[in-house]
Amino acid sequence: MDTRETTRETPQGRSPADRSLLGRLGSFTVRRRWWVIGAWVVLLAVMASYASGLTDRLGSGGFEVPGSQSLAVQRDLEQRFANQFPTTALVTVHDEARTVDDPAFRAVVEGIAARVGAVPGVGGVQSFSSTGSPAFVSPDRRTTYLVAGLTGDQNTQLETVPEVAAAAREGVAAGVEVETGGAAAFYERLNEISRHDLEQAERVSFPITLIVLLLAFTSLVAAGLPIMLALVSLGVTLGALYFLAGVTDMNVYVTNTASIVGIGVGIDYALFVVTRFREELRRGRSVADAVPVTLATSGRAVALSGATVIVALAGMFLVDIQAFRSMAIGSMSVVAVAVLAAITLLPAVLSLVGHWVDRLRIPVLRPRAAGGEGFWHRWAVRIMRRPWAFIAAALVVLVVLAVPFAGIRLGQPGAAILPADESPRLATERLAAEFGAGVTGPMEILVDTPGGAGTRANLERVDRLTRALQGDEAAVSVQSLTSVLPRAGLDAYARLYAGGLDGVDPELAPAVAGLANWDRGADLARITVVTREAPESEAAEGLVDRVRDQYIPAAGLAGQARVGGATANNLDLSREISGQLPVVVLSVLALSFVLLAMAFRSLVLPLQAIAMNLLSVGAAYGLIVAVFQWGWGESLLGFTSEGHIEVFVPLFLFSILFGLSMDYEVFLLSRIREEYLRTGDNELAVARGLESTARTITSAALVMVTVFAAFAAGRLVPFKEIGFGLAVAVLIVATLVRTILVPAVMRLAGRWNWWMPAWLDRWLPRIALETADEDRPATRVREPAGA
C-alpha cells in the first residue's frame, strides 16, 4: 500500500486550558467553582419545586395520527354527536347466583347507576335499565355493564375515575363483583402505577449502583459523585418539563422515559469524567491542571456522546406523533442537562474536592494500578491474532439473536399491561369473556348522509355497508340505523326516521340516539361494530382493512365513509411508524456519521461504529420480540404477553439504543485515537485503548444494566420492554462489540481506520478529541495514501 508521511504536532509548554474550548471551560470552573456550584444549587432548587407538579400536566393521549381516518372519526364523535362523551368509564356488575331478570339484581344495578350518576364529573349513565338494549346483558344474563360519560378535561376525567369506582362498589353485597374499566380507568391506573414503579426503580437502582461504583472507584467520595450528577440532572429536567408541558402536549410516559435515560447517562458521564480526573491526579498533576485536562479529554468524549444521543433522539421528530415527540423532548432534555452538568457542575465539585476524591476508601477494596499490560491488553492482542474467527463467531451470535425481529407486531397497550389484580384489567377481562373481546374497543364507522340520515337514499347506503359487515365472521355485532328492528325493510326504517329522533318510539329512541347526529343536521350516520377478537388482534386489523378497501367502495361510499375506533387508530399509528422508520433510521445514521467523522477525522471509524451499533440494536430487538411478543419471559418477568410489542417501543428504543451504544464506542475510540496519535502503531493503540477503558466501561455498563433492570422489574409491560431492551443492548455492546468486534475489525482495517481524504479533512469542521497531555511529544503518523 502506498503511504505518505503526515506530521501531527502537539504544542509544547502550553497550558491545556489554552488549547481547547472545554479545557478553558475547565479552568473557568476551577477559578469560579463557588459561582458555578451556587448557580446549579439555585437552578435545582427552583426546578425541583416545580417537578412535583409535572404529573398533573401530562396527558394519556398523543398517539393519534394527524390526517388519518381514525382521528377524523374521533373528532367527529366528540364534536358533532350530542351526549357522546369522548371518554367513558365502564362499570361491570356480575352475580354468579342471579340474573338481571331478578328484581334484587336489577335493584343493585340501578343503585350503582344512581350513585355513579351523582358523582361530580359524570355527565350521564347508560345501562340496560335506562336503554332497554340487550347489548348491555351477557348471554347467560348474569353480567351487565354501565357506561358513565365523563366531562371536563383529561386531568379532570382521570380524577373522577376513583370516585366512580368507589361509588360503584359502595354498599354492594358480598357475591356481587363490581369492577371499573374503560379508557379513563386504564390511564388513571397506568399513571399511578407508572409513578410508583418509577419511585421503586429509583429506590432499587441507586443502592445497587452505589455498590457498583464503590467496586469501580474503591472510594465513597468518588462513588457518590456520579449519583449526585444523575439526581441533579433528573431534578432539573423534570422541572423544565413542567414548563414545557404548559405550552405543548406531553404524554404521561415522558416521566419514566426521561428517568430511565437520565439516570443511566448521568451516572455514565460522571463516571467517565471522575475516572479521568483521578488518573490525571495520579500522574502528578495539580487539581487546577487536572480539571482542564479532564474536560479536554473525557469531557469532550462526554459532549460527543451526548450530542450523538440527542441526534438519535431527534429522529423521533420525523414521525408526526405528539406522544413520540414529547418522549423525545423529555429524553433529549435530560441528556443535554446531564452533559451540561458533567462539564460544569462536576468539574467545579472536583476542583473543590481535589485529592479528597480518593478518600473514605473501602478497606477491603484496593485501587487498581493504572497502565501495564493487564488482562484486557492481552485479550485484545489475542483477538487481533485471529480477527476473522472472532468476527465470524460474534456475527453468528448477533444474527441469531436478531432473527425474531423479522416477525415483530406492533400494538397499542391494552389492559393486559396492568397487573392482574387491577380493576380496569378485571373489568376488561369480564367484558371480553361475557360480551366478546371486541366490546372493549369497538370499530366506529361514520357515513356522510347529506340531506338527513333518515332519508331512504341514505338508509340504503348505510344498509349496504351494514349487511356487508354482518356477513363478516370477524364481526360479532353491528349496530346501525338499519339494524335496530328485526326483519324491517328500508321503507319501514324510512317511516321510522321520517320525523328525526323526535318521531321515534320512546322505547326505541335510546337505542338509535347515538346512531346519527340528529340534533346537528343528521348529516352523519354511525355504525358500531364489535369484533370477535380483541381490538389489538390481527383479525380485528384485517376487518378494518376489508371495510376500508372492500366494503366501503362496494357500498358506493368511497370517500364518504371513515373507519375509526381503537383498532383503526392502532393500525394507522403502526403504519405511520413503519412508513417513517426507514427515514428516521437513515437520518440518524447520516447525522451520526457526520458527527463521528468530524470528531475522529476518519470515514472508516464512523462506518464501523454505526455497523456494530446496528447489529447490537437488531439483537436487542430480537430478544424483545422473543421475550415479550412470543411470551418467553412471562413467568420470569411477571407479565401477560399480548402477542405484540407496544407501538412506541421500537422507534423509541432505536433512538435511545443507538445513542447510548455510542457512549462506549466514543469513549473507547477516543482513547484508542489518543494512543494512535502518541505511538502511530494501530495494534498497540487498540490494545492500550481497550486496557485503559476496560474497567470504566465495564463499571458504566453494570450501572446501566442495574438502572434498566430496575425499570424492567416494574409492573407495566411497556417499561419492562424498554428496560429489558436497554439492559440487553448495553450488555451486548459492552461484551461482544467492545471486547471482540472493535479490536478485530480495527486490526483488519489497519491504518485505514484513520483514513480521510485530504480535501475533506480541510473542509469538514473539527470536533477535536486530541489529548491535552502537555508531556506528549510530537508524533509522525504514517497514513494510507489519499488521506
Name what the model sees in each region.
Residues 54, 88-89, 93:
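Short, conserved active-site loops that position catalytic residues or coordinate cofactors/metal ions
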Residues 1-57, 62, 122, 139, ...:
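Membrane-embedded transmembrane helical bundles of large multi-pass transporters/channels
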Residues 67-88, 96-184, 409-634, 666, ...:
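Structured non-transmembrane domains adjacent to transmembrane bundles in polytopic membrane proteins
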Residues 92, 147, 275:
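Short beta-strand segments
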Residues 88-90, 128, 345, 741:
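Short beta-strand segments at enzyme active-site cores
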